Amino acid sequence: MTALPRYSVFGNPVAHSKSPQIHQQFALQEGVDIEYERICADIGGFAQAVSTFFGTGGCGANVTVPFKQEAFHLADEHSDRALAAGAVNTLILLKNGKLRGDNTDGIGLANDITQVKNIAIEGKTILLLGAGGAVRGVIPVLKEHRPARIVIANRTRAKAEELAQLFGIEAVPMADVNGGFDIIINGTSGGLNGQIPDIPPDIFQNCALAYDMVYGCAAKPFLDFARQSGAKKTADGLGMLVGQAAASYALWRGFTPDIRPVIEYMKAM
């Protein structure tokens, strides 16, 4: 009997990951059977865990916190997206045995905004809140959609300015944000502790979409604040999660899943 194609997600912690359910839905669309497991790698043991997985028949892997930068250094070659982001969330085993690193986070975000939420990015003004790895990973793809302007705001200005210089966008301290934006994206992790970014409510007055890159309860504080402050539409990051997973699946298998029914399936869980 032929073994099923094996995939995984590496993280620490990783027990909460919804990736196995998402990828099994993609496999149903393709009409194939796959194995997809969560692997909690020890801090300091990521490289060995990856080597063991691929050495025992693994075909592809997703990578989540805190290993995305380490995965970047582990990969033998990189996509342009991964090089720009400096982080890898997808590892692909090539026919020559080498590992190729890619970053599909930006694709997941942009596809959710443009295809599922039906809001164009081209010609729009975008405010990014936060300057960590999550934000850095999505800037290259957002720029490909040719927005009129991207502004990055962070509590510590130096980190925002570093990304602004790297990607040719604007930076401001979070407390100094003013003016209306079409799309406001929260890439901070404060919602996990019930906190919202220190921004004035009037920036949401002409906001077509307020988006939090996290999903579920952690997104609620920011999205509630945005809605109460005038944002026309709000969304958490579930669509981004499904979208980046679909892009990974396509890289591994050459089959592009339809993300809409999978988003609805995950909402109903």
Swiss-Prot record:
Pfam families from the UniProt entry: SDH_C, Shikimate_DH, Shikimate_dh_N
User: Which Gene Ontology terms of cellular component type are present?
Assistant: cytosol
A GO BP annotation:
shikimate metabolic process
Chain sites annotated for binding NADP(+) = D80, G130, A131, G132, G133, A134, N154, R155, T156, R157, A158, K159, M213, G237
Question: Which residues are shikimate-binding?
Answer: S17, K18, S19, T64, N89, D105, Y215
For molecular function, the Gene Ontology terms on record are:
NADP binding; shikimate 3-dehydrogenase (NADP+) activity
Q: What does this protein do?
A: Involved in the biosynthesis of the chorismate, which leads to the biosynthesis of aromatic amino acids. Catalyzes the reversible NADPH linked reduction of 3-dehydroshikimate (DHSA) to yield shikimate (SA).
- HAMAP family according to UniProt: Shikimate_DH_AroE
Name it.
Answer: Shikimate dehydrogenase (NADP(+))
Source organism per UniProt = Neisseria meningitidis serogroup C (strain 053442)
Gene symbol here is aroE
